Amino acid sequence: MQPTATMATAATTTTTTTATVALTTSWDNATGRPTAEPDPILDNYVLLVVVMSLFVGGTLVVLSGVLLLCKRCWDVHQRLNRAMEEAEKTTTTYLDNGTHPAQDPDFRGEDPECQDAETERFLSTSSTGRRVSFNEAALFEQSRKTQDKGRRYTLTEGDFHHLKNARLTHLHLPPLKIVTIHECDSGEASSATTPHPATSPKATLAIFQPPGKALTGRSVGPSSALPGDPYNSAAGATDFAEISPSASSDSGEGTSLDAGTRSTKAGGPGAAAGPGEAGPGSGAGTVLQFLTRLRRHASLDGASPYFKVKKWKLEPSQRAASLDTRGSPKRHHFQRQRAASESTEQEEGDAPQEDFIQYIARAGDAVAFPHPRPFLASPPPALGRLEAAEAAGGASPDSPPERGAGSAGPEQQQPPLEPDAERDAGPEQAQTSYRDLWSLRASLELHAAASDHSSSGNDRDSVRSGDSSGSGSGGAAPAFPPPSPPAPRPKDGEARRLLQMDSGYASIEGRGAGDDTEPPAAPARPRSPRAWPRRPRRDYSIDEKTDALFHEFLRHDPHFDDTPAAARHRARAHPHARKQWQRGRQHSDPGARAAPALAGTPAPPAGAARPARAPLRRGDSVDGPPDGRTLGGAGDDPAIPVIEEEPGGGGCPGSGLCVLPSGSVLDKLAAGLDERLFPPRLAEPVVATPALVAAAPTSPDHSPA
């Protein structure tokens, strides 16, 4: 049967339907059931990540273990090395056994700012006294190698004096505990509190008393605030702790305070600390540190100026720095030693030393000390000191009491007044209360300016608290001179304040050397003991003759003031150029600048006096001939006559070229020369003819010969 179109259409429709059904069935199969197993590629990635993480973690654990092991080995190695050859830069402070709890020897500060933490702990444990720094090799005289300087110790001044005394007197004291704080070189701050018996061979040398008993008066006068220094006497033990707690030392200083007071810190200058208020408890460490920092911020000057760590800052006013300005390396050690051991000076920005002087004025008669040694017998270690304020002394003609027992404040601390003629000597005496060092200096300079400089010698009586200013006595000696060397005071109750003038070598108070020639006067006593002078005030000025002589020798140039002002200022602005000019100049003729004035003139006659500007011989002064060739009397013309010749040949009378002076003029000239050569003849002075006398220039520098 032939297929027709209708059948073909039906077949096509059937085929299409079958295919559609099949497609639908397969699609349903693909989406209907889930995937049985994941893709194998993804499974490989997960396995790799897990293995890598395990490997990295294990590596980190092993590395950290190795590093910890190395660090522990390095610590042991460092400890052994430190035991054999000591670390160079250490700062050592000495502590009492009972004052501070022993720290753990294995303590390691891990914070990155180990320097600050260690410094704070060191500052809180150490005392704030003046520092004395020295070398261990220099102390024990056993420098093994020249490059090995040994450990450098820094003690307080009290410890230093105790060390010196302990070498002489055998004190039965417990051994030291030494806290050594090394610099933070490695990452840790090692603070080992072990008492190194092997490192320091004299570690058993004891410096401190045990905390139970106070200091004996054997080696130290108990009046000294810094032990061993009888000149900076502050007060007794409890009085000093009660009145001025800001000056009490912290721990390591062997002051005459109780051990409880040592561990106590007052919160400010006003609070009072009794001796038994706070015992040395174990929990006082952080509180002590906090109170230390609070006190350091609250008080005026850290502590009071005598109990402050000396800044090793060399200023040009200190002599150790001014002796050589740049400081050669050979002098660095000496400069550091000197700056450390010299007494603290008042720096520029420091607050005035008011609290200490107020304390001395308040203490008055209430505080009694054993009297210090005779003042000039053993001079203090610092060079020049000046006695600024003295508390009440004993009732005797040598040291009369200056004020009553109940004096309050430094306003009543008046300087000693001279007798009645001196009582109205001017307002600069009536109101003098030395607030600090600088007002003391100002008052000294006022006295020096008010006095008569040219009265007599330098030391004698040119300044005696303004003695010649108010009285009509001129340059006479003071009416009631004090005893010749100041005798040691008979009474114990006296507190001294010794200030160091920055002039370097201000001499200790006493009579000058020239005063021994004075006949001892027997003066009548004034009415009241307050009018007696305590001690002559030192004259810091020099008289005009010495001053002029010093300046002449200083500059080797008699005509220095004749130069124009611009050149002079230029020379002062460049002192090295001036010194080079001097070096070439000092062996040449000092009168060379006056040579153009006398260039056209011949030498004067042989018998005449030398011109003033001839080269100076040894022993001549600048402005005039020496004593053997003194000038004429009061009526003489001070100009030196010089004969002026007209230009012409020697055979002048034969040739009519020159005009001879008349006979009367020659007579006058001869009379003038006669008058110059024979000065005792003073009857009628002859007025020299101006045409024939030339005045040689004299320098305006009128320093007496």
UniProtKB/Swiss-Prot annotation:
Chain intervals with Basic and acidic residues compositional bias: 489-499
Composition bias, Basic residues: 567-585
Keyword Iron-sulfur: no
Extracellular side stretches: 1-45
Segments of skewed composition (Polar residues): 245-254
Coiled coil region boundaries: none
GO BP annotations, alphabetical order: negative regulation of calcium ion transmembrane transport; negative regulation of calcium ion-dependent exocytosis; negative regulation of voltage-gated calcium channel activity
Phosphothreonine: residues bearing it: T698
Single Gene Ontology MF annotation: transmembrane transporter binding
Protein name: Voltage-dependent calcium channel beta subunit-associated regulatory protein
Lineage of producing organism: Eukaryota, Metazoa, Chordata, Craniata, Vertebrata
